[in-house]
Amino acid sequence: MQLNMLKCKLHQACVTDTELDYEGSCAIDANLMDAAGIREFEQIHVYNLANGARFTTYAIRGEAGSRMISMNGAAAHLCSEGDRIIICCYANVDESELDRHEPALVYCDGDNRITHQRNGIPLQVA
C-alpha cells in the first residue's frame, strides 16, 4: 500500500512579495528549495499562519541567495508581504519503506535564513 507522507517543509518562511500578474505560482529562493528538496514545478501546499488560508500550488525557482518567497497569480490573493507560512510537499511512500522515511524539515527565521534542519518533529506532550 502507498501512503501519502510528508516529504519536506519550509517552516515559518516569510512571504517577501506578492505578484498578482506574474506567471507562476510561488517563487522560492533556490537555496531554500534545495535545502528542503523541493523540485521546480513540484506541487506544494501552503499554510498561512497569519490568516489560516490553506492552498495548493506549485513551486518555481527564485534567485539563489535572495531569500525570496513570492506568491504569484491567484495565490497572491491568499497571502500578504510579511505573512509567516509553512510550505509542505508530500510523496507517496510504500508501506514497507515507512520505517526508513525521514522528511526534510527546514526552519526559517523572519528573513528566510535557515535556522536549523531536522528529519522529524519532536513528540508533542500534554
UniProtKB/Swiss-Prot annotation:
UniProt EC number: 4.1.1.11
Record key words, sorted: Autocatalytic cleavage, Cytoplasm, Decarboxylase, Lyase, Pantothenate biosynthesis, Pyruvate, Schiff base, Zymogen
CDD domains, per the entry: Asp_decarbox
Gene3D superfamilies: 2.40.40.20
Location in or out of the cell: Cytoplasm
Changes after translation: Is synthesized initially as an inactive proenzyme, which is activated by self-cleavage at a specific serine bond to produce a beta-subunit with a hydroxyl group at its C-terminus and an alpha-subunit with a pyruvoyl group at its N-terminus.
Cofactor stoichiometry and binding remark: Binds 1 pyruvoyl group covalently per subunit.
Role description: Catalyzes the pyruvoyl-dependent decarboxylation of aspartate to produce beta-alanine.
Homology family: Belongs to the PanD family.
Listed name of the protein: Aspartate 1-decarboxylase
Taxonomic source organism: Alkalilimnicola ehrlichii (strain ATCC BAA-1101 / DSM 17681 / MLHE-1)
Gene it is expressed from: panD
